Amino acid sequence: MRLHFCSLLLLYCIVFVSSFLTTDALACLPDQIQALIQFKNEFESDGCNRSDYLNGVQCDNTTGAVTKLQLPSGCFTGTLKPNSSLFELHQLRYLNLSHNNFTSSSLPSEFSNLTRLEVLSLASSSFTGQVPSSISNLILLTHLNLSHNELTGSFPPVRNLTKLSFLDLSYNQFSGAIPFDLLPTLPFLSYLDLKKNHLTGSIDVPNSSSSSKLVRLSLGFNQFEGKIIEPISKLINLNHLELASLNISHPIDLRVFAPLKSLLVFDIRQNRLLPASLSSDSEFPLSLISLILIQCDIIEFPNIFKTLQNLEHIDISNNLIKGKVPEWFWKLPRLSIANLVNNSLTGFEGSSEVLLNSSVQLLDFAYNSMTGAFPTPPLGSIYLSAWNNSFTGNIPLSICNRSSLIVLDLSYNKFTGPIPQCLSNLKVVNLRKNSLEGSIPDEFHSGAKTQTLDVGYNRLTGKLPKSLLNCSSLRFLSVDNNRIEDTFPFWLKALPNLHVLTLRSNRFFGHLSPPDRGPLAFPELRILELSDNSFTGSLPPNFFVNWKASSPKINEDGRIYMGDYKNAYYIYEDTMDLQYKGLFMEQGKVLTFYSTIDFSGNKLEGQIPESIGLLKELIALNLSNNAFTGHIPMSLANVTELESLDLSRNQLSGNIPRELGSLSFLAYISVAHNQLKGEIPQGPQFSGQAESSFEGNVGLCGLPLQGSCVAPPTKYPKEEDEEEEEDEVIEWKAVFFGYWPGLLLGLVMAHVIASFKPKWFVKILGPAKGKQVDPVRLFMNLDSRWDSFNNKDTVEEEVI
């Protein structure tokens, strides 16, 4: 009966799992399915559902054995142990565990059990330690990828892997020399990537290397010495060669690479080059389509480009090139990407239309010394960046005719005149820090593609254009440091993707609270900069309710920085000026999880809303230079990520909440020039602050202020108790000796009067009507009336 039950349970499990299997996985035997489930259960896999996991499973239709396993990226977290059920899948031919988090895991030697493996990819999976020697048993491997881990030790033992065609060991910490017989023992090797390690020594390439199948070689960012360049020049089948930052003491003569007739991509950045090898008569592979010469100490524009008519991509950024860009450069027939950033170029040879007929699509000549009018951009422009130059005059209207243009960055120049009224087709418009005038064009049509609009630090006037509501993809809007006069744009909260809104240093006015006194409730806003305007009024208690972006989350598109628009050949990242920890600074890159609010320099009043405590991911809060009153909200203690807090120059009262000491990331706090009192809380968050952070509060005391909190002198508790007891004894003695004799005399008199009943007595109390009079009650009655009589006299005296 027990055996029958177990069989039914196993059958149920198989049927249940099979319901999630793909067509390729349906052929799997029960024991293989069980091993797969056990393997999954060895790790935390909350971000991985069963169907995602099993989609990467493939079994042989004949044997039912698992032959392919490809885990989804970011699916597993945990340690890959030697006894893992993974190593029971002996028929595996393809195994890809890349982009998972196998924390604290070394590479188990049990990988050698999988002797049928042909493809093994463990890239970006947090593996550490040395590569086990047993990996040399995987003699059928054709593809081995161990890149982007923290593997150490000498070069892995791969000599026996004679079928290898792909070997990627980049971005690790391997040290020592490359085996001198590596290439002869791996005759099929076509892809070898060793960059970003600690490899040393020279490179030995045998004379027979002309028959080598190696077509892609990356050796950059290591610590080689001795012979490197000459041996590589023997690998005549190379089409992709990367030799960045080789740490060679002498300049490299590019003419050495002339034998590489098939070379297409050559990256030799961060090396010193022999100037003569950059001349137009130098022999160089004419097949080149991409040449990367970043940071090579080049001082003159390389004439070698004249002969390289197949070039599509040129990068000579971060050099020392002076003078003008020659006119012939724009006539290279296939040139589509030109990066001239960070040189000392002063302009362009030829007319202002020298670029017009160029084939260039991505053009970046930012951070140079170019002056004069801006040239007419190429007809096929996609990306155009000229920030940080000294161009003058108007922005050319020819930009409006560039239908392919996506990114336009002309910031940090000296442009004047109006903003062209044709920018809604662009994803990125950055015109920051020029001298542009007029208003922001109200020409953003329905379906506008704009994601970033930065026109800060100009001389713009008018109001914010309501047509911005058509920019449903707008993420970043900055109009800071202009002369815009308008009320707060509550209507912008209809934009579902707005992350950054910067209105600082304009002439905005009116209330910040919505007309219905409800929460502001921007759905995705993370940075709100409203400082140095004329906003007035108070903020309702629920002002910060429903700010969804204050909660931690991972970007679905994988972006790290705001405005991080990436292409294979360019990156654009939004920049902004932020006041942080008391300092005003420009942030060249702003992380997507960064969250800050700055309302400083306005005329806001009333209490700071307690709902501020709901913004748990807020990093910086600046409410200084306003007229806020009341206490510092205790709910600020819930803002656990807070690093910078500035509440200075308001009218806040009460004590500084001790709960703020629980904010472990709080590095800067200023409450200067308020009406606070009491002792400054002691703790690491407060003790490290400057005295100026608390000055201007008459009632505050304690470190870091000079004066300590001194209480009035008090007596010792024992003496106080003894004196209190003595006073109580004296008081009771006075009561006893003063009250009881009088009471006794009163009782005697009452007894006498009650016995004889004189006429005056009867007039006061009235006839007894045959009742016996109680002497005590009689005395109390007389005493009460006597008090009434005395009180009457007192009232009369007051009237007089």
Curated annotation (Swiss-Prot):
Q: Where is the signal peptide?
A: 1-19
In terms of SUPFAM superfamilies, this protein maps to:
L domain-like
Cellular component aspect of the GO annotation: plasma membrane
Q: Where in the cell is it found?
A: Cell membrane
Pfam (any one):
LRR_8
Ranges of the LRR repeats in the UniProt entry = 89-113, 115-138, 139-161, 162-185, 187-212, 214-235, 236-259, 260-281, 285-307, 308-332, 334-357, 358-381, 382-401, 402-423, 424-446, 448-471, 472-494, 495-519, 522-546, 591-615, 616-639, 640-663, 665-688
| UniProt cross-references to PROSITE patterns, sorted A to Z | LRR
**Transmembrane regions listed in the UniProt entry:** 734-754
Keywords (alphabetical) are: Cell membrane, Glycoprotein, Leucine-rich repeat, Membrane, Receptor, Repeat, Signal, Transmembrane, Transmembrane helix
Cytoplasmic side, ranges: 755-800
S-S bridge residues: none
Protein's membrane topology:
Single-pass type I membrane protein
- Which loops or segments lie on the Extracellular side of the membrane, by the record? 20-733
UniProt-listed InterPro entries: Leu-rich_rpt, Leu-rich_rpt_typical-subtyp, LRR_dom_sf
Tell me the domain of life.
Eukaryota
**Which of this chain's residues carry glycans?**
49, 61, 83, 96, 101, 113, 145, 160, 207, 247, 342, 357, 388, 401, 470, 622, 638
**Family named by the database record:** Belongs to the RLP family.
**Protein's UniProt name:** Receptor like protein 26
Recorded source organism is Arabidopsis thaliana
**Record lineage:** Eukaryota, Viridiplantae, Streptophyta, Embryophyta, Tracheophyta
Gene symbol here is RLP26
